[in-house]
Amino acid sequence: MSHRKRVIIIGGGFGGIFATRKLANYDVDVLLIDKQNHHLFQPLLYQVAAGILSPENVAIPLRLVFAESDNITVRMEEVQNIDRSSQRVFTDYNEYDYDYLVIATGSTYNFFGNDHWQKDVFTLKTLGGALRLKNHIQTQLESSLITHDKEARKKMLSFAIV
């Protein structure tokens, strides 16, 4: 007796969602694993930082995206290990067998050997990062209104975007 092929997709970003959608109409069981329970639309994070959009406008629940697909299961777990020889994925809560594995975990920052920069910059890759930047900008603007030191005000109102 043959079973339906099991596909595990690690990552709920653009690549993971694209792969999962492509497999939604096939006779396979798809397990989408991501450490977040939502897809984050990163191209609009700058609008969260600017206060134009709310976080819920750029974070779409993964289960909602695939609610109509009977062959897709979404799990909010973090992958700890992959054993390719036994075709098994180990998460912080479970272990899963697979026939096919798609790794779509996205990208990371590159500070080009200058990792010390991390402590001095704001990044726009997460909701937390966007909200930290928004709060920093608001704090700087408010502080600039109450200072009488022109040089301090100039610093408070100076931002570099790279």
Language-model regions: role of each:
Residues M1-R4, I72-A160:
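FAD-binding core/adjacent interface of flavoenzyme oxidoreductases
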Residues S2-I72, K154-K155, A160-I161:
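Beta1-alpha1 glycine-rich phosphate/pyrophosphate-binding loop at the start
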